[in-house]
From Swiss-Prot:
Binds directly to 23S rRNA. The L1 stalk is quite mobile in the ribosome, and is involved in E site tRNA release. GO terms for cellular component: large ribosomal subunit. GO terms for molecular function: rRNA binding; structural constituent of ribosome; tRNA binding. InterPro entries: Ribosom_uL1_bac-type, Ribosomal_uL1, Ribosomal_uL1-like, Ribosomal_uL1/biogenesis, Ribosomal_uL1_3-a/b-sand, Ribosomal_uL1_CS. This is Large ribosomal subunit protein uL1. Part of the 50S ribosomal subunit. The keyword Repressor applies. SUPFAM superfamilies: Ribosomal protein L1. It comes from Rhodopirellula baltica (strain DSM 10527 / NCIMB 13988 / SH1). One of its GO terms (biological process) is translation. Keywords: Repressor, Ribonucleoprotein, Ribosomal protein, RNA-binding, rRNA-binding, Translation regulation, tRNA-binding.
C-alpha cells in the first residue's frame, strides 16, 4: 500500500471515532483540507445481503435531488425515432453497428450506455467489454428502455446507477465537495432512503449494517442510521 499524503494523514487525525448524524458527518467531511481539485463525494453502504442469491441483488438507479456535479458521457444504441429522441436529449453518441464496432475494438470513453430493446441483439455480444466495466445496459438498471430520450435526460441531470459488489456493499457518487452542505446531505439521504426501501423480503437479519461517506482523497466518516 502506498504512503498516504501529508494532507490525508492530517485529515485522519480529525476522523471521528464514533458514528455521527448525517448533518454532522457532512460538516466533518467538509472540514478536511481542500485539494486543488473539486473532490467527488461518495456514499458507501454495507448491506446484510447474500450476493449469491438472485433475490438479494441490490441494483437500480435514481436521480439525486441536486445532481452529482459531473456531466456524464452517455451513448445510446437506437434507430429511427428513438435515435432522434436520444440526440435531442443530449446523448453524446447515438448509433448501431458502427458504435458496436467501436466498442468491440476497445473504446469505452463514456459513463453510461443505454439501449432500446430492439438493439439488444447487437449489444449483447459487447458484454465481454462492457460487463467488467459496469457499462452493460440492463432492464433492471433502467438502461434498456424504449424511452431512451427520457433516460438520457435523467443521466444528464445527475442520475446514478448502483449495484452491490461481491461483498454486499453498495457505492455511489453523491456530489462534489464544493456543494453546499445541505445539498450534499439531501443527496445522501435520498440515496440511503432509496436503498432502504429496496430491502429484499428474504432478509431476516439486519439489512443496513453501516453507512459511511468520504471524498476522493479523504478518510471516511461513519453515519448513524
Amino acid at each position: 500500500m502506498g504512503k498516504k499524503s501529508k494532507r490525508y494523514r492530517a485529515a485522519l487525525e480529525k476522523q471521528p471515532k464514533e458514528m455521527l448524524p448525517l448533518g454532522k458527518a457532512v460538516e466533518v467531511l467538509k472540514t478536511y483540507d481542500a485539494t486543488k481539485f473539486d473532490q467527488t463525494v461518495e456514499v458507501h453502504m454495507r448491506l446484510g445481503v447474500d450476493p449469491n442469491q438472485a433475490d438479494q441483488i441490490i441494483r437500480g438507479s435514481l436521480v439525486l435531488p441536486h445532481g452529482i456535479g459531473k456531466t456524464q458521457r452517455v451513448i445510446v444504441f437506437a434507430k429511427g425515432d428513438a435515435a432522434k429522441a436520444a440526440e435531442e436529449a443530449g446523448a453524446d453518441e447515438v448509433g448501431q453497428e458502427d458504435l458496436a464496432k467501436k466498442i468491440k475494438d476497445g473504446w469505452t470513453d463514456f459513463d453510461v450506455c443505454i439501449a432500446a430493446p430492439d438493439m439488444m441483439g447487437l449489444v449483447g455480444p459487447l458484454g465481454r467489454v462492457l460487463g467488467p466495466r459496469g457499462l452493460m445496459p440492463s432492464p433492471r438498471a433502467g438502461t434498456v428502455t424504449p424511452d431512451v430520450g427520457k433516460v438520457v435526460s435523467e443521466y444528464k441531470a445527475g442520475k446514478v446507477e448502483f449495484r452491490n459488489d461481491k461483498g454486499g456493499n453498495v457505492h455511489a457518487m453523491v456530489g462534489k465537495m464544493s456543494f453546499e452542505a445541505n445539498k450534499l446531505e439531501e443527496n445522501i439521504a435520498s440515496f440511503v432512503d432509496f436503498i432502504s426501501a429496496m430491502k429484499p423480503q428474504s432478509i431476516k437479519g439486519t439489512y443496513i449494517k453501516g453507512v459511511a461517506i468520504c471524498a476522493t482523497m479523504t478518510p471516511s466518516v461513519r453515519v448513524a442510521t
